[in-house]
Amino acid sequence: MQFPIFQEVARYREMTAAFGGYNHQLSCQEGQFFDMKNMTSEYFPAMSPRKNRGIVKSFVNPQGILDKENLMWIDDNELYINGVKQDLGDVTITSESPKTLAKMGAYVIIMPDRIWYNADNGECGYMEKTNTIPKGERITFSLCEANGSTLSWHEAEYYKDHDPVDGDYMMSTVNGKSSLKVYAASTKLWMTVATTYTQITAVGIGKGFEKGDGVKLTIDSGVSELSNIFVNEEGDKVSTNTTIMDRTDDCITVVGILNKTLTLTDKEMTVERKVPDMAFITECNNRLWGCSEDGHEIYCCKLGDVKNWNCFAGIATDSWAATVGSDGKFTGAITYLGYPMFFKEDSFIKVSVSATGGHQTKETKCRGVQKGSHRSLSILNETLYYKSSACVCGYNGSLPYSISDEMGDVKYYDAVAGSLGDRYYISMRDAKGVYSMFVYDSKKGIWCKEDNTKVLSFCKHYDDLYYIDADEKVMKSVGGTLLYDVPEKATEGKFNWLVESGAIGYSSPEHKYVARINLRITLELGTDVDFYLQYDSCGEWEHKFNMSGKGTRTFSVPIIPKRCDHFKYRLTGKGGCKIHSITKTTEEGSDI
């Protein structure tokens, strides 16, 4: 008798020993995870939960953080350095949040408050300053030397009857235009004085200003003798932009010419040092650079002087401004490879800084910074990373490129980012308003998803990355560093973590059976791990196994074979572990 011969069922054994992180796409490969929570690539090729964070400091109303040799932050309108509140005197920080904090030399700039703080000596003040001399107060205008000393002169008529001596000054008026001349005995000629100076005297007019400040002078119109000084008409007032050449509390010296000393008591006058309205700022080459929100103006301050933005004397240290003709608002700014860069959503403008003051701009059309994601700009290992409208981009000096294909079709907004070591940390929200913290390992090209932290601001300080949790109002450290001896300091306890595979089995048209799964895993004491399976995208997860203990071992998951087209697995746990490998044994069935 002959018996039929049965073919042995094909059995396949696949082992994954290198895990490629987060990949929220249908093309999620073996070793990648369609979803995850609180995982890290730090122990690649193994997959592991992230490190426990440090709870560094709690806040009342956090508004910003900055590294300036020590950690600085603003909490509830107060400035702190290393946890110590600073006395700002009459300077008041407003409640507007978040703040933009920038550093230039010893200075820390607080925007939009327009406050400067000297971290070396503790001095502080406002970048802007206005002094007003009201009607009824005496204002005197007189010709003077550059240092403010009195200058004596005579009209041209005087020298018809008197012989000039060396150094005599003469006021010459031709066709209503006055000019000052000085007599040179060696040549017996009257030489025109190239630059003349006027001293303006009034109680308190120069208080709070400094020599070299670029200011705007405004006075009530109607004084013809001042037409050579105040050249701009502004309704019922006239004004001029000039530089203070010398000052005391009660007088200032500016460039200008008068043909007689003049005293007024019926005019109001203001002296203003103004700072342009800027949406974003960055420091480069001992200058602070900024851009207007409307996307048409770029500015920089006077060399080494954050308070002066309107000094235009024609020298290399002048402040500077340029107009940008392209459409769209500015969305961010940063200094990269020695260039101030100003971003729009569809372009960036790079400024070539010149030592002579002849700065030049060049615009490149490409993926720019997404509106609301200006805090995503961060430099990591000489590469600039940021969130664009479509993706997270990397930029190394040529053109931006996407690094976030693994995030799939989910759209994210309002990104905030920081960097530490080889990792780029970014917190952003989806269209439903749910925030997620992602980490990009630039060395391995791997993304990991952590939790739902909403970050107000990141700040790298020495060997750790600090951030302000906007919901909990707490400063935390990524690496667990605890800087300050405060009651709330603590190391984060055990947290839940999760990894979920993509659909497995799409590469074969036949139905299949999951016969066995083996996990090679290192567990810390007190860690529990659960294993789940889902068949044919049914939406229900079947619990298969629980793992606990200590040390490294292989767990064999007991599975009753179930026929399916494809399947997914999920691992959840609480506590520390390292997943070294996952081995799947499957048996093929028919395609019916």
Please provide the spans of the model-predicted regions:
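Beta-sheet repeat architectures centered on beta-propellers
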Residues: Q2-N70, D75-E78, G83, G368-G372, ...
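Small/polar beta-strand repeat architecture
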Residues: F6-M15, K129, G136, G148, ...
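Short hydrophobic/aromatic-rich beta-strand motifs
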Residues: N70-L71, A106-I110, K160-Y183, G212-T218, ...
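Short loop/turn segments that connect beta-strands within the blades of beta-propeller domains
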Residues: D75-D76, M104-G105, M111-D113, G176, ...
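Short, surface-exposed terminal/edge motifs of secreted or surface/virion proteins that either
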Residues: E78-V84, R114-K129, Y169-A194, S224-N228, ...
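Extracellular/surface-exposed low-complexity repeats and stalk/linker segments enriched in Gly/Pro
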Residues: D90-E96, K135-Y169, V193-Y197, T270, ...
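Hydrophobic or amphipathic alpha-helical targeting/insertion segments
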Residues: K99-F141, A185
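Beta-propeller and closely related beta-pinwheel folds
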Residues: E272-S419, C448-D451
